[in-house]
Amino acid sequence: MSNYFDKIAKVNYEGANSTNPFAFKHYNPNEVILGKTVEEHLRLAVCYWHTFCWTGNDMFGAGSLDRSWQKTGDLLVGAKQKAEIAFEFFQKLGVPYYSFHDVDIAPESNNFKEYLHNFNTIVDILEKKQSETGVKLLWGTANCFTNPRYMSGASTNPNPEVFAWAAAQVFTAMNATQRLGGENYVLWGGREGYETLLNTDLKREREQIGRFMQLVVEHKYKIGFQGTLLIEPKPQEPTKHQYDYDVATVYGFLKQFGLENEIKVNIEANHATLAGHTFQHEIATATSLGIFGSIDANRGDPQLGWDTDQFPNSVEENTLAMYEILKAGGFTTGGFNFDAKIRRQSTDPYDLFHAHIGAMDVLALSLKRAAKMIEDQTLQKVVDNRYAGWDQELGQKILSGKASLEDLAKIVETQGLDPKPVSGQQEYLENLVNSYLYR
């Protein structure tokens, strides 16, 4: 095993009173909550791209991070070194999963044969490292947005040759995901949108991306992939307006192309912020529509209008998110993937550990708080009581289709219905949630 992070042997759980910065205070993977271990509930994954590919660059400055694998003259040699160091990190952190884009793990090329050679070379290494360490692939995906060929979109591109290139990448990445035992395959349309309607045919582009998703579903069945297909919603950035704006928009798209039973959503907290929603709202919408799949765990900055991809640090926000997930029965094939990056000034390699340790503790503590809310059922009882009328005769008659508008008008008139407003008790419920958060 690589020994890049030689100052750490293994991050362990030491409890809330520990002062060791390289120990978990709340994340105890073997602790049983609601019949499952914390590890089974959270299904944590480290992402390859932000953790091992980002150089620390931004729009106003060059890379600030010193990473040995990014300095090799031979990019494939660097990719091999990166894989070794990545699995050292996964093992020492103790996460069960990881995730990647195709070009995160292997050098890209404008020559497809060279792309395949590079990619397959690294997939061979990943397969071996998974076998050696027991670390599994939560999901794989293809980067169909960074290369200049995709500046006008991938599946939505006005040039069908670009569509074909994207299809070739997804074909390759899906096959690799299946080979590596990946439990999901993600589709994020980073360039599937537009900058201006002056040069855009919305109807045509929507039909193109719809056909692309149908091709992905067809290939899933052709190769016997048992995982879940996921679309990741985002309203904008890098395009002005993206077609997968939010969970509700994605559901409408899936319905249009008959894919609502084939594809679910991978929800990112920061993307919810950009869409003007809370993280909790997007999860609740997905579970209510039956398309909840997985989570990209991070946070945004409400004062900034871009995807900051910071590590989650709010127990309050994540307890409410976890509550919605637990109410829906928890994850099946999905999990919490840390789509988050350290800050540009966090140049010490061990800052990667601090970031992930803190985020894992936040999610574990949020799980415990949400589980207590589920066990007590106090909040749910208030909601059930609020809608109790719909379980009674009039409510059931309306929902079952046994009452027309005329019937309802007669009921109001003959029975003299005069419903009175009932308190929503928002302040009480907010206090109730705080009593779980800060006990």
Swiss-Prot record:
User: What is the name listed in the Swiss-Prot or TrEMBL entry for this protein?
Assistant: Xylose isomerase
What cellular component terms from Gene Ontology apply here?
cytoplasm
List positions binding Mg(2+) 1.
Answer: 232, 268, 296, 339
Q: Which residues bind Mg(2+) 2?
A: 268, 271, 307, 309
The UniProt similarity line reads: Belongs to the xylose isomerase family.
Q: Which reaction does it catalyse?
A: alpha-D-xylose = alpha-D-xylulofuranose
GO molecular function terms here? magnesium ion binding; xylose isomerase activity
Coiled-coil spans in chain: none
Compartments where located: Cytoplasm
What PANTHER family does this protein's entry cite?
PTHR48408, XYLOSE ISOMERASE
- Where does the UniProt entry say this protein principally localizes? cytoplasm
